[in-house]
């Protein structure tokens, strides 16, 4: 059995599976190197008997550069015959008007066309126009080199892959699923009606109806269809995704660190406030006490000296003039002396009264400041007012506070007791 015959039989058997009413097989011919070459074989009621195979007796029909062949299209008395299948070099064809034009190409199905070397078109109306392109399915189209389609009405451009009915892939794109569509280069759409838009290059749409909305992205839904990524491991590198457990852990650590930092700062502020408050209070008290004691001592000494002096003088005068009748001028001198002494004691009393009033106003201001409230709600700011009194003095206080969290709060206030008597305070509260 010759090599030509083996090729003829193999091609004929394949073509028989897709038998059409009309077919042809080109005669073997020798090339310049003397090696026989068989272009194509197809089995149908009309077969070239030179190939040595046939299913039904029929007259030879040869085509391709044979002027004796009838023209393509309707011919003979029936006038309804379709065009014959046509092939060039080693190919297999089947179906009405199938064409395999490239070397080593295959066209199977009515009007199927394999136009370039090593192209494969399988299915009625399928087209493979690129080198090494494959179109499988009715009306499928592989329109560029190395393009691959599988499914009815699927389409792929150069280096693209479209799998599924009506799937469409652009250059270097991959579309998998019914009606999936990739309009951008170097992108992937997987799922029913998934879509990567033309200006969203290097993107991926995964899942039914998923659509991309930017380049260099991965979408698992669309604007009104959101999905969850499940069973996601914790990320280990900077550009890894983070799962919920990992996020909760990081948030807990961040909050704990913030709490410790806030507590430390609060303690520092509280210590400083306490030291300042104690220092101011101590200084104020010491100054007031020192001033009062000094003034009292000065007044007492002045009064005593004056009293002693005047008493001695009066006594001497009295002794000198005991036996003398007291004149009106002497009475006047004694009266003036008494008035002067009384005046000095009156001044001392006024000073002591003023000191008492200042102390009373200070205590009233302190009472008013202590009546101010601090906020109870976390994150809340309050404004509060209060009054206070001590003996005959009264004071008005206003203040504001802020609660940082359940454990920490801040408060400050100022009190006014009349004239220039102003007192203020600031406090920091920690609870546990």
From Swiss-Prot:
Description of its domains: The signal peptide, cleaved at the inner membrane, guides the autotransporter protein to the periplasmic space. Then, insertion of the C-terminal translocator domain in the outer membrane forms a hydrophilic pore for the translocation of the passenger domain to the bacterial cell surface.
Gene3D superfamilies: GSPII I/J protein-like, Serralysin-like metalloprotease, C-terminal
Listed result of changing residue 209 to H: In strain: YPIII
Function: Collagen-binding outer membrane protein forming a fibrillar matrix on the bacterial cell surface. Promotes attachment to eukaryotic cells and after invasion, is the major adhesin in infected tissue. Constitutes an alternative uptake pathway under conditions in which invasin synthesis is repressed.
Entry keyword annotation includes Protein transport: yes
Induction line: Induced at 37 degrees Celsius by the temperature-dependent transcriptional activator LcrF (VirF).
Domain of life per record: Bacteria
Coiled-coil portions: 242-263
Signal peptide: 1-25
Key words of the record: Cell adhesion, Cell outer membrane, Coiled coil, Membrane, Plasmid, Protein transport, Signal, Transmembrane, Transmembrane beta strand, Transport, Virulence
Subcellular localization: Cell surface; Cell outer membrane
Protein species of origin: Yersinia pseudotuberculosis serotype I (strain IP32953)
Stated family: Belongs to the autotransporter-2 (AT-2) (TC 1.B.40) family.
Name used for this protein in its record: Adhesin YadA
Transmembrane spans: 379-389, 393-404, 411-417, 421-432
Region Translocator domain, residue ranges: 380-432
Outcome (variant: residue 124 to S): In strain: YPIII
Spans annotated as Surface exposed passenger domain: 26-340
Assembly and oligomerization: Homotrimer.
An example Gene Ontology molecular-function term: collagen binding
Biological process (GO), any one: protein transport
């Amino acid at each position: 059995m010759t090599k030509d015959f083996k090729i003829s039989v193999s091609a004929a058997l394949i073509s028989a599976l897709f038998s059409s009413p009309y077919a042809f097989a080109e005669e073997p011919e020798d090339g310049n190197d003397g090696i026989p070459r068989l272009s194509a074989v197809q089995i149908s009621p009309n077969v070239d008997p030179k190939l040595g195979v046939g299913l039904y007796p029929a007259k030879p029909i040869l085509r391709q550069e044979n002027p004796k062949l009838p023209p393509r299209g309707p011919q003979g008395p029936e006038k309804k015959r379709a065009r014959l299948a046509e092939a060039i070099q080693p190919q297999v064809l089947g179906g009405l008007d199938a064409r395999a034009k490239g070397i080593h190409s295959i066209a199977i199905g009515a009007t199927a066309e394999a136009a370039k070397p090593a192209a494969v078109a399988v299915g009625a109306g399928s087209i493979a126009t690129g080198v090494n392109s494959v179109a499988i399915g009715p009306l499928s189209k592989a329109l560029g080199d190395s393009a691959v389609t599988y499914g009815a009405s699927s389409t792929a451009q150069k280096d693209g892959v479209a799998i599924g009915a009506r799937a469409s892939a652009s250059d270097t794109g991959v579309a998998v699923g019914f009606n999936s569509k990739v309009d951008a280069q170097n992108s992937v759409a997987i799922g029913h009606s998934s879509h990567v838009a033309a200006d969203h290059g290097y993107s991926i749409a995964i899942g039914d109806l998923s659509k991309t909305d930017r380049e260099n992205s991965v979408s698992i839904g669309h604007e009104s269809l959101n999905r969850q990524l499940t069973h996601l491991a914790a990320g280990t590198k900077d550009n890894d995704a983070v799962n919920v457990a990992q996020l909760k852990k990081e948030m807990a650590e961040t909050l704990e660190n913030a709490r410790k930092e806030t507590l430390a700062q609060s303690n520092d502020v509280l210590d400083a406030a306490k030291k300042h408050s104690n220092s101011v209070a101590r200084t104020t008290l010491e100054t007031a006490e020192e001033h009062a004691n000094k003034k009292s001592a000065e007044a007492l000494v002045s009064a005593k000296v004056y009293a002693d002096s005047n008493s001695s003088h009066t006594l001497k005068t009295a002794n000198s003039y005991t036996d003398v009748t007291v004149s009106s001028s002497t009475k006047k001198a004694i009266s003036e002396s008494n008035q002067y002494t009384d005046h000095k004691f009156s001044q001392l009393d006024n000073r002591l009264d003023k000191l008492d009033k200042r102390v009373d106003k200070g205590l009233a201001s302190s009472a008013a400041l202590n009546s101010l409230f601090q906020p109870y709600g976390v994150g809340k700011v309050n404004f509060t007012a209060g009054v206070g009194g001590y003996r005959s003095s009264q004071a008005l206080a206003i203040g504001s506070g802020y609660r940082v969290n359940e454990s920490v709060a801040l408060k400050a206030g100022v009190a006014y007791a009349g004239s220039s008597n102003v007192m203020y305070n600031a406090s920091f509260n920690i609870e546990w």
